[in-house]
């Protein structure tokens, strides 16, 4: 039998999706599963964007009759619309500094492929989004983590810790802001300190900013694209998935003012031919979504966040920090092993015919032991379901055999 590649075998499982077969089996047994494991919003997708997508799809047979490839960098009118969007957020770029991608994940993979050599190191605060590790391994690059602490709400670690981690193989620093999995939001002052290191050691600065719209309690988002003197260093990843509750559109983008990075990334863009045309049509229409939509969405997420934080912190032995952005947080649990506990919830437990699905935090750390007693949870379902999910968690911890305190 032909053998699987060594690289393929080394790829990590998704901390977010690896327990899906157990959730599917629970549903087959008639158990209702509350999904707090995945950032799939239940917020309504903007109707105006869906309507425009539908109208263009319906008129395609009469107007042209062919669903063509787009330009490999994306439809020009969409890239212009993205420039207008970024300008409103204080970021000035041109269409020829944007490559539209199949979700933000492809943008990440493109940048890693273009910028990283085997053995190069990327410094990332942890816990961190599990897919970063997958794409780093595909490039034979190494992630070097800087631990943050749940007691501080996973605030950005001291900049001195970053500098101590820099070696001759360090090629980049990566941040996610607002952050998944922690919900933390880095300030302008913190980003300026990171920028200082990037300049001092001539590094790339990779920035995942897909949760830009989701900042709470008066906190404001500051983009790394607004940092001066880093035109050749910064590569931004973005996506329509969470911003417009349109994960299935599979459209994102890579943005950079580094013309050399852009030119080489275009080789990859051409090799994969083009991003999804219907997704781009949706994305262009969604750029015109009124601010009232985001105001209502933000209000809803704040209410959901508060339910999660208050509810989890009332459970004996649990701790949930207060997220400043996105719709995730990592919680501390009185358990022996988060992988075993999260699987047990799906295989051996139900409360009145329901259970809750969490993402074990072991997959968000370079050293799984650091996440052994933690889980990432999302607040992407309605408040009534969140309350029911928290009740399931509370009852589960009363009977879990591996409870530690």
List each model region and its residues.
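PLP-dependent enzyme catalytic core of the Aspartate aminotransferase-like
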Residues: 92, 163, 344-357, 364-405
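Conserved glycine-rich beta-strand-loop-beta hairpin in the small C-terminal domain of fold type I
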Residues: 284, 301-309, 320-333
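N-terminal small-domain helix-loop-helix segment of the aminotransferase-like
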Residues: 2-103, 110, 286-289, 399-405
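Conserved PLP-anchoring active-site segment centered on the Schiff-base-forming lysine
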Residues: 114-136
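Structural signature of PLP-dependent enzymes
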Residues: 263-269, 286-309
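Active-site PLP attachment segment
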Residues: 226-263
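Helix C-cap/helix->beta junction micro-motif
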Residues: 26-29, 139, 200-201
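Active-site phosphate-binding strand-loop segment of PLP-dependent enzymes
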Residues: 149-217
């Amino acid at each position: 039998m032909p053998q699987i590649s060594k690289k393929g075998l080394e790829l990590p499982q998704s901390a977010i999706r690896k327990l899906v077969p157990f959730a599917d089996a629970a549903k087959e047994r008639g158990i209702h599963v509350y999904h707090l494991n995945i950032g799939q919003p239940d917020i309504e997708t903007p109707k105006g964007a869906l309507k425009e997508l539908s109208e263009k799809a319906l008129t395609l047979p009469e107007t042209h009759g062919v669903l063509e490839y787009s330009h490999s960098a994306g439809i020009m009118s969409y890239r212009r619309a993205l420039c207008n969007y970024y300008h409103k957020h204080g970021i000035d770029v041109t269409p020829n500094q944007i490559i539209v991608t199949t979700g933000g994940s492809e943008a990440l993979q493109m940048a890693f492929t273009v910028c990283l050599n085997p053995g190069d190191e990327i410094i990332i605060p942890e816990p961190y989004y599990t897919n970063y590790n997958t794409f780093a391994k595909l490039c034979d690059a190494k992630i070097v983590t800087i631990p943050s602490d749940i007691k501080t709400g996973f605030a950005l670690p001291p900049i001195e810790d970053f500098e101590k981690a820099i070696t001759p193989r360090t090629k980049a620093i990566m941040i996610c802001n607002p952050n998944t999995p922690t919900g933390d939001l880095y300030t302008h002052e913190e980003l300026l300190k990171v920028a200082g290191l990037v300049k001092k050691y001539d590094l790339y600065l990779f920035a995942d900013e897909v949760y830009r719209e989701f900042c709470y309690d008066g906190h404001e988002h500051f983009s790394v694209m607004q940092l001066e003197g880093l035109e050749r260093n910064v590569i931004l990843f973005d996506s329509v998935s969470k911003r417009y509750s349109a994960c299935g559109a599979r459209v994102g983008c890579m943005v950079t003012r580094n013309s050399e990075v852009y030119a080489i990334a275009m080789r990859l863009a051409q090799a994969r031919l083009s991003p999804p045309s219907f997704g781009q049509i949706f994305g262009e229409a969604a750029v015109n979504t009124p601010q009232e939509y985001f105001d209502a969405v933000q209000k809803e997420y704040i209410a959901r966040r508060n339910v999660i934080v208050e509810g989890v912190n009332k459970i004996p032995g649990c701790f949930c920090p207060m997220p400043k952005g996105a719709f995730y947080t990592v919680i501390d649990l009185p358990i022996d092993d988060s992988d075993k506990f999260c699987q047990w919830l799906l295989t051996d437990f139900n409360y009145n015919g329901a259970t809750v699905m969490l993402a074990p935090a072991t997959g968000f750390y370079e050293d799984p032991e650091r996440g052994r007693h933690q889980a990432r949870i999302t607040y992407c379902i309605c408040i009534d379901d969140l309350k029911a999910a928290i009740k399931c968690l509370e009852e589960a911890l009363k009977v879990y055999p591996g409870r530690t305190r």
